[in-house]
């Protein structure tokens, strides 16, 4: 893993970075599915300004995803060992920073060091009371406020919910791509997360497009 780091450094080295200002970080919330029974297993995503809550992920578990010198939150529900009666809600804040890659790396590493664990799970009430391990980080003030907003639509969130950190969106800087996914360097194509698009389906489709263009050349 940590391909996003390698891509960030490589893109900068060969001079194809278009913008590097996007930073997404936050926390993974989990709460009993009983508190969201009226959502009917919906995988919705809620939006407010620069905050996203979702998609709502049902009946799985938050697990650590190792990235060389730190771990970040991930979600699994595809095996029996991950099954649960909980709903996981990725709560992410998107900000602009002049050095996006360095900033997201800094936030993730600071969180990882402060919690002293691969991923840290705490009660939301500890963050609300200022007693969380990440309460000293000003970057989590906006996450705290977002949890309060989310509690308006999720019953007993602040009282019975938990959150896990570090949580980031590990994507490299944006690169200019043509409609055929070719970069400014002839013959160099990007697909999937290296092109800033998450998901296996996206990676598969983009890989086919890039491959067909390479064969055509």
Residue ranges and their predicted role:
Residues 1-217:
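Residues forming the flavin
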């Amino acid at each position: 893993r940590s391909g996003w780091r390698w891509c960030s450094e490589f893109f900068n080295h060969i001079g194809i970075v278009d913008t590097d200002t996007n930073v997404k970080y936050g926390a993974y919330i989990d709460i009993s599915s009983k508190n969201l029974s009226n959502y009917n297993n919906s995988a919705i995503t809620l939006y407010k300004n620069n905050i996203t809550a979702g998609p709502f992920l049902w009946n799985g578990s938050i697990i650590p995803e190792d990235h060389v010198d730190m771990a970040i939150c991930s979600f699994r529900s595809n095996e029996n060992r991950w099954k649960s009666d909980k709903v996981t809600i990725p709560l992410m804040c998107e900000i602009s920073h002049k050095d996006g890659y360095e900033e997201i790396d800094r936030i993730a590493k600071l969180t990882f060091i402060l919690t002293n664990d691969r991923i840290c799970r705490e009660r939301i009430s500890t963050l609300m009371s200022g007693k969380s391990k990440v309460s000293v980080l000003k970057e989590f003030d906006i996450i705290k406020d977002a949890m309060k907003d989310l509690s308006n639509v999720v019953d007993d969130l602040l009282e019975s919910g938990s959150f896990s950190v570090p949580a980031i969106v590990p994507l490299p800087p944006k690169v200019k791509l043509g409609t055929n996914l070719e970069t400014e360097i002839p013959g160099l194509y990007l697909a999937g997360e290296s092109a800033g698009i998450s998901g296996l389906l996206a990676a598969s489709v983009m890989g086919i497009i890039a491959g067909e263009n390479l064969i055509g050349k």
